[in-house]
Amino acid sequence: MKFAILAVLLCAAMLAASPAPVDNVFTPDKIPYGPVPAFVPAGAQLAVLEGDPTASSGDFTIRIKMPDGYRIAPHWHPKRENVTVVSGTFKVGMGDTFDETKMGSFAAGSFAYMDPDMHHYAMASGETIVQVHGMSPLAFNYVNANDDPSKKK
């Protein structure tokens, strides 16, 4: 009996000492940014850190790197959106009309969430990186259909 307990403890100690897998860890210099999808304005970069935002269900985590002055027109999502500002200043306003004078400014470390169907718009002040976490599929609905970049020729 003592041998069996010792063997279990030894196995547990070996597992605890094993190095953590590195394929689910992203250091800032190794984040795989690429172009944003067509439903957001060109010019920003996007990295999928976890999950698949286009899947029919499941969690996803993405990062969006935006240049200074980058704007996202008023839009809404059918599912909750959780946003953390990683760097820069992210400006967010609520409503159906983009109005920079009514936007709040959020520095790195800030967190906000938008409930389903909440109409909002955003802008980067300086190069800005935000991390977005939510439930798939990520749907992006513009208040004004003419603002949807994927519909422009």
Question: Where do the protein language model's features map onto the residues?
Answer:
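Hydrophobic h-region of N-terminal signal peptides that target proteins for export
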Residues: L9-A17
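Conserved short histidine dyad/triad with adjacent acidic residue
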Residues: F60-H77, S105, P116
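Double-stranded beta-helix
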Residues: N24, T101, M123-K153
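Short beta-strand His + acidic residue motifs that chelate non-heme Fe in jelly-roll/DSBH
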Residues: I72-P74, V92-G93, M114, H119-S125
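Glycine- and acidic-residue-biased ligand/ion/polar-headgroup-sensing regions
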Residues: P67-Y70, H77-T97
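A short, N-terminal "cap"/entry segment at the start of jelly-roll beta-barrel domains
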Residues: S18-G58, D147-K153
